Regions:
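Low-complexity, acidic/polar, glycine-enriched regions of mature
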Residues: 21-180
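N-terminal signal peptide c-region/cleavage motif recognized by signal peptidases
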Residues: 15-18
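Bacterial N-terminal signal peptides that target proteins for export
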Residues: 1-8
Length: 180
């Protein structure tokens, strides 16, 4: 085999290795809590079912997090069923969140992330959402609040006794990530 063929063979064999990510992260544990307010009561729906992965390459990390809509539990099965109907959960069963962060972000006590959230068949952008970052050994714990609203996703506010809920639907995020 002559030298050009050896170089070509080496490039073909090494190219997949060179294209791989520098590092990867996996979501180990999560608690996502949405809050809806009505003049007669307050509602919190909690999910621990989020899955996520982060892939870092060339100093940037791309994260994707997904959670089934039906995994949120408010403590009232009738309310949860109505939430699935209002959010079109049968047609759009997942909430997904995408963000890109610099690989050095984990060294900060606070990060500001631009989020793209798909929910109920709609996509909303949230700029510079603050999250607190705590390193625990090789794990990174993040927490913060996404300032979501029902109107961001074209969801009509549910009503009780002809009184609609407030438009605000903040989502509290608590996640633990570890290197893969």
């Amino acid at each position: 085999m002559n030298k050009p063929h050896r170089v070509l063979l080496a490039l073909v064999l090494l190219a997949p290795k060179l294209a791989q990510a520098d590092s990867q992260w996996v979501l180990e544990q999560s608690t996502l809590t949405y809050h809806v307010s009505h003049p007669l009561h307050q509602i919190d729906g909690v999910s621990h079912a989020a899955r996520g992965k982060g892939v870092c390459h060339a100093g940037q990390c791309d994260f994707l997090i997904a959670v089934p809509v039906k995994s949120f539990d408010s403590g009232d099965s009738n309310r949860d069923l109505h939430m699935l109907q209002v959010t079109r959960g049968a047609q759009f069963p997942l909430v997904s969140v995408r963000t890109r962060l610099p690989e050095t972000a984990s060294a900060s006590a606070t990060i500001h992330a631009d989020l793209e959230i798909e929910f109920a068949g709609q996509t909303a952008q949230y700029k510079q959402v603050a999250f607190q970052v705590v390193m625990q050994g090789n794990q990174i714990r993040i927490s913060g609040i996404i300032p979501a609203t029902l109107s961001d996703f074209k969801i009509d506010p549910p009503s009780l006794l002809a009184i609609p809920t407030k438009n605000e639907m903040p989502v509290r995020v608590e996640m633990t990530w570890r290197p893969q």
